[in-house]
Amino acid sequence: MSQNSNPAVVLEKVGDIAIEQRPIPTIKDPHYVKLAIKATGICGSDIHYYRSGGIGKYILKAPMVLGHESSGQVVEVGDAVTRVKVGDRVAIEPGVPSRYSDETKEGSYNLCPHMAFAATPPIDGTLVKYYLSPEDFLVKLPEGVSYEEGACVEPLSVGVHSNKLAGVRFGTKVVVFGAGPVGLLTGAVARAFGATDVIFVDVFDNKLQRAKDFGATNTFNSSQFSTDKAQDLADGVQKLLGGNHADVVFECSGADVCIDAAVKTTKVGGTMVQVGMGKNYTNFPIAEVSGKEMKLIGCFRYSFGDYRDAVNLVATGKVNVKPLITHKFKFEDAAKAYDYNIAHGGEVVKTIIFGPE
């Protein structure tokens, strides 16, 4: 494709993805960088927008460029940029907060109410040839870390953030409900942080098999457990811990039965982190939360240092993200990539769309 073109993968409306030309962005802020996008992962949120046009309060009202799990190469820098140079390969943190909100100043910029997050309406995403980013939301990819691995840094950063929230350390016994990309990476980070037991729970055997590449010490298939069988599910998981409860439980599925079972699986004084986004409302045993004096923590994306730490985990070999990638598509086949993800949800873990040539 021409250097003078800027093709973008655009969600025109629900169920309609097209490649269209967008203006090549120009640097107006001296701290910004122009990037050539090289690889982008498909996230579940992209699929939600494609199928239903919205997630919670974020509703698609106009065509929007998709994608937020990306890596790229620096092709131009603003006059004040000092952190990167032309030619650097980088992972791109896709959410830029207000520099002035209380949340940002308090150190939790991921909670900033004015966050501009890629591919969250009305903000355009990263599935485009050229993209602008502030320099301080880029992390250099060390030699030996591929663009494909760089695109996986975004979901890996969620795993880093959730493990920090939970305080996972050497000897921690962990259970992960949901073996999708975020669940797998959350478990892998737990092992990297020193967890001695990491049990994955999911309804798909192929995903549980893949969990062995992400630090699983054991797995449990939960497909036979309906919403009213949460205690039975928890009992089955606890058998794999020698009948004991877990120190830390990460709920990464958002499924009602798993949320209930996660509470029941957490030990007295233990910690449960709700990572998965499920329904707006769910039923769970709140009396048990109080009676155990357990910590129930919400987790939203990632914050300061998480992207940097995620890149370091990949670069040092402590987390291998390569087994996460199950499918790859050319840029011009992006619509096919999304349709394939929907049609083969139980088979697909992470799909990478390469940048335009």
Swiss-Prot record:
| Cross-referenced Gene3D superfamilies | Medium-chain alcohol dehydrogenases, catalytic domain (3.90.180.10), NAD(P)-binding Rossmann-like Domain (3.40.50.720)
According to the UniProt entry, its GO molecular function terms are: D-xylulose reductase activity; L-iditol 2-dehydrogenase (NAD+) activity; zinc ion binding
Q: Which keywords annotate this record?
A: Metal-binding, NAD, Oxidoreductase, Zinc
Keyword Endoplasmic reticulum attributed? no
Cofactor binding note of this UniProt entry: Binds 1 zinc ion per subunit.
What does the record give as the reaction this protein catalyses?
keto-D-fructose + NADH + H(+) = D-sorbitol + NAD(+); xylitol + NAD(+) = D-xylulose + NADH + H(+)
What is any one GO biological process for this UniProt entry?
sorbitol catabolic process
EC class name: oxidoreductase
Task: Name the InterPro entries for this protein.
Answer: ADH-like_C, ADH-like_N, ADH_Zn_CS, GroES-like_sf, NAD(P)-bd_dom_sf, PKS_ER, SDH-like
- Amino-acid positions noted as binding substrate in the UniProt annotation, renumbered to this chain: Y49, E154, R301, Y302
This protein's record includes keyword Transmembrane: no
Q: Which domain of life is it from?
A: Eukaryota
The protein's Enzyme Commission number: 1.1.1.-, 1.1.1.9
Cofactor annotation: Zn(2+)
Which amino acids does the record list as binding Zn(2+)? C43, H68, E69
Amino-acid positions noted as binding NAD(+) in the UniProt annotation, renumbered to this chain? D202, K207, V275, G276, M277, C299, F300, R301
What single Pfam family name could you report for this chain, choosing any that match? ADH_N
How does this polypeptide assemble, per the annotation?
A: Homotetramer.
Q: What does this protein do?
A: Polyol dehydrogenase that catalyzes the reversible NAD(+)-dependent oxidation of various sugar alcohols. Is active with D-sorbitol (D-glucitol) and xylitol as substrates, leading to the C2-oxidized product D-fructose and D-xylulose, respectively.
Q: Which family is this sequence assigned to?
A: Belongs to the zinc-containing alcohol dehydrogenase family.
**Protein name per Swiss-Prot or TrEMBL:** Sorbitol dehydrogenase 2
